[in-house]
Every structure is written in structure tokens, then in C-alpha cells.
UniProtKB/Swiss-Prot annotation:
Allows the formation of correctly charged Asn-tRNA(Asn) or Gln-tRNA(Gln) through the transamidation of misacylated Asp-tRNA(Asn) or Glu-tRNA(Gln) in organisms which lack either or both of asparaginyl-tRNA or glutaminyl-tRNA synthetases. The reaction takes place in the presence of glutamine and ATP through an activated phospho-Asp-tRNA(Asn) or phospho-Glu-tRNA(Gln). The gene is gatC. Keywords: ATP-binding, Ligase, Nucleotide-binding, Protein biosynthesis. This is Aspartyl/glutamyl-tRNA(Asn/Gln) amidotransferase subunit C. GO terms for biological process: glutaminyl-tRNAGln biosynthesis via transamidation; regulation of translational fidelity; translation. Pfam families: GatC. One of its GO terms (molecular function) is ATP binding. Belongs to the GatC family. HAMAP family: GatC. It is an enzyme of class 6 (ligase). It comes from the Bacteria. Heterotrimer of A, B and C subunits.
Amino acid sequence: MAIGSEEVKHVAGLAKLAFKDEELAKFTGQMDEIINMVQQLSEVDTTDVPVTTHVTDAINTLREDVAVKGTDRDLLMKNVPQSQDGYIKVPAIIDESEE
């Protein structure tokens, strides 16, 4: 399965990335190589290989989840540049236009 520049353009558009023509050619080649490597891996016979769910024998080392009192909300809100209805207001980063 070969990856073409149209597929790379489509994925780049979904990620809101823009490439120059030279970059598009470079990334198209790199993506094609990656897809070919994954295809090679899928052809490996793993019939007698035991299933691996964890690479190591490490156990969960997270601490117990304990609720503690946080910083006063009113004090925190005094330090934000803009707020609205008790929330911190930030610039929009998601383009909701239809593309």
C-alpha cells in the first residue's frame, strides 16, 4: 500500500498543519516507508509466540489518591488576565469552520 501526497495533505489538514511542496514530498516518502515497515511486521509469523500484555514485571507504583484542600479559587482568579462566569477565558484554538 503506497501513501500518496493527497493522503498526507488530508492528514496534515486534519492536524491543522501546512507544508511546503518540498516538505510534502519528504513527508510523503517518510510516511510510505513507515507504512511499508508496518506491513512487514504484520507478515511476521507469531503463531508460537506467547501473548505479551506487559513488557516488564513492574507493578503499579502510584500513591493512594487522597483528596487535599487546594488553593482558594477567588485568589487564583485574581491572577488571570480574563475570566467569564467564574472560568478562565483563553483565546480560541479550535477552528470550527466546515472544511
